[in-house]
Amino acid sequence: MAKYVAAVDQGTTSTRCMIFDHAGRVVAVDQKEHTQIYPQPGWVEHDPLEIWTRTQEVIDGALRKSGVERSEIAAVGVTNQRETTVVWEKATGKPVYNAIVWQDTRTDQICNQLAQDGGQDRFRPKVGLPLATYFSGPKITWILDNVPGVREKAEQGEVLFGNIDTWLIWNMTGGVNGGVHITDVSNASRTMLMNLETLDWDDDILDVMRVPRAMLPKIMPSAAVYGAAVGALEGIPVAGDLGDQQAALFGQTCFSVGEAKNTYGTGCFMLLNTGLKPVPSQNGLLTTVGYKIGDQPTVYCLEGSIAITGALVQWLRDNLRFFDFSSHIEEYANAVEDSGGIYIVPAFSGLFAPYWKSNARGAIVGLTRYITKNHICRAALEATAYQTREVLDAMNKDSGVDLTALKVDGGMVFNNTLMQFQADILGVPVIRPTVSETTALGAAYAAGLAVGFWKEVEDLRANWGKDHEWSPQMDSATRERLYSGWKKAVTRTFDWVD
């Protein structure tokens, strides 16, 4: 009798496998980091083969730690860093180039050329997204144009494209020996190639971006049985696939219209459930697919994507050597009462929502001799909260409904200083659930629903519990004064790259 569901959570900096029981509790977790490759300023790559190796290692590790027998696992789900682009040879399984990561800005010129006819919102009515370096379509075009011989192979059906979900599921189900080449609607909605109404690849956009349809995966529901695993999970159904932010929405049980969550990881991503129709944004948000369970109707979302939040803490740790462990930032930040009047705008990959300015670059403004490392650490945490406020304001305008509380998850939600400042600068309560790693949980839920381990989404609501709630403690005058300073600081980053 199957008692558990497994999930592979492949993120920007690490891969983990988590095993959950029927109540959504974590039974075991194993996690490993992978190499970040920076060939040029603005370029970010990963080695797809390293990611596949790490995936196999963490599956083995989680099984070993849990003591769970393979026969006790009902299904395995996959969730992934979205938009990151892999192209590989069908016959050998060998990538033709490193994975181009979502943060990578090398496709700036491709996006600018595409925008010359119709502007940045040229494809938005069909795909819900602005032309930006963030999304997969231009990354595929770059690989086809810049890696010798690949375009010819693509046109002959000899190479395959996938985001990380597709790459992992293809390998997990056999790879060159019959691996399944699929993606789900949530990941496909981030390529800039899928029509939100038809839930199919859009031939007009494929023609404009010069992407052969033959290399694209089949688009499937987020909860469905795609194939059977090989290796450590031999014979287990691979049955759930969600982009990481949609998985977090699902794991937070935001199944009703108007429910929202914010995930704090490498970047920050706020998603609002808008129901069964795509809602166009007038305020710099993305219209995207939330999830699709089997043959049930598709659920759509508005999303505010912030490129750099946790990655700013990593930068202070790795590049400036401010501390040895990311968790230490809270201690330094708490050594001062405020940021000393400075703001850090971490536009390392340009600015995402609500600005969509790929030519912005990072800045620290307001520096004086008074400023110490502690002030910089505090300003780094505050930058995450300010960016979230900008997205929440946009979401309130688009939806016409003011959010009354924010569910949060991800690694940074254990930083109490950040969470309190977040509640202060939003003016609404911030709520952390008992299982904060909701991304993996969402993928597990999707896989479990596909095989009947859970019967329906309402069964999952009972698993959600509140761990902690932060209430606003800042007066409104201070809140607006600080936020006004942030808005001024952001303008200093615009148009930095010619």
From Swiss-Prot:
CDD domains according to UniProt: ASKHA_NBD_FGGY_GK (cd07769)
Record: residues binding ATP: 12-14, 266, 310, 314, 411
GO CC annotation: cytosol
SUPFAM superfamilies: Actin-like ATPase domain (SSF53067)
Enzyme class per UniProt: transferase
Documented activity regulation: Inhibited by fructose 1,6-bisphosphate (FBP).
Domain of life assignment: Bacteria
Keywords assigned by UniProt, alphabetized: ATP-binding, Glycerol metabolism, Kinase, Nucleotide-binding, Transferase
Protein name: Glycerol kinase
Family annotation (PROSITE patterns): FGGY_KINASES_1, FGGY_KINASES_2
Entry annotated with the keyword rRNA-binding: no
Keyword hit for Protein transport: no
Gene designation per UniProt: glpK
Documented EC number(s): 2.7.1.30
InterPro entries, A to Z: ATPase_NBD, Carb_kinase_FGGY, Carb_kinase_FGGY_CS, FGGY_C, FGGY_N, Glycerol_kin
Binding site for sn-glycerol 3-phosphate: 12, 82-83, 134, 244
Residues the entry annotates as binding glycerol: 82-83, 134, 244-245
One GO BP annotation of this record: glycerol catabolic process
Pathway where this protein functions: Polyol metabolism; glycerol degradation via glycerol kinase pathway; sn-glycerol 3-phosphate from glycerol: step 1/1
Catalytic activity: glycerol + ATP = sn-glycerol 3-phosphate + ADP + H(+)
Primary role: Key enzyme in the regulation of glycerol uptake and metabolism. Catalyzes the phosphorylation of glycerol to yield sn-glycerol 3-phosphate.
Molecular function terms, GO-annotated: ATP binding; glycerol kinase activity
Organism, scientific name: Roseiflexus sp. (strain RS-1)
Stated family: Belongs to the FGGY kinase family.
Entry binding sites for ADP: 12, 16, 266, 310, 411, 415
